[in-house]
Amino acid sequence: SIKKADLVFFDSGFFVLLLKIFKNINVKKFSGYKFLGLFFDYLKINKNKSIFSVDPNFEYSKSNKSYLRSLGLKKIHNYVAPKYNSLELNDKKLLNLLKKVKPNFILINIGGGTQEILGLYLKEKLVFKTTILCTGAAISFFTKDQAPINNFIDKFYLGWFLRLIFNPLIFFKRYIFGLKLIPMVIFSKIKILN
């Protein structure tokens, strides 16, 4: 699904460092935090835009709606996503809501590798013009539902550390699992396309 995206950012500082160390490839990290900061600045100026927020649970949905309202937005729609089967993703209820609302932006705030699959599913099924943004939990840095990341922490690739301190039970396991990226980078043939 990532290969079929219109645009993908290097938002993992760990991945960027691995490319530098093992492949001598220099890329700049462009985090979800930084992207959403710029996007939210855009929305503050363009308050007439409509947002459809796909959220992981009711609590985050309330926080996300409250934050988007604080930007001055009036047309905000929220949807609490069910637990998706990434091999057979199908959500007719979501499709029907989106076809009815026709938002300018669909903000997919679910993680766990499902956001990109849902984004592709929507891209292939929707016929109206919209922008689908798969940002995972990045909005939680603004709503304060997750670790309180700021520009300094983001710039120096310390977001992972702050998340680990803020919620060790979730992120320790996630980061241990993420170590599999090391051999993937080492043994993959990576081409740079200009």
Residues covered by each model-derived region:
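A transmembrane-helix-recognition feature enriched in membrane-embedded lipid enzymes
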Residues: 14-22, 148-194
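An alpha-beta-alpha
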Residues: 43-71, 176-189
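Structural motif
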Residues: 84-96
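Short glycine-rich anion-binding loops that position phosphate/pyrophosphate groups of nucleotides
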Residues: 14, 110-115, 138
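Short beta-strand elements in bilobed, periplasmic/extracellular small-molecule ligand-binding domains
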Residues: 71-85
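Electropositive, gly/pro-rich neighborhoods at or near active sites that engage anionic ligands
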Residues: 1-50, 56, 60
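Short, flexible loop segments at boundaries between secondary-structure elements
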Residues: 81-87, 128-164
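Proline-aspartate-enriched helix->loop->beta-strand connector
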Residues: 98, 102-108, 112
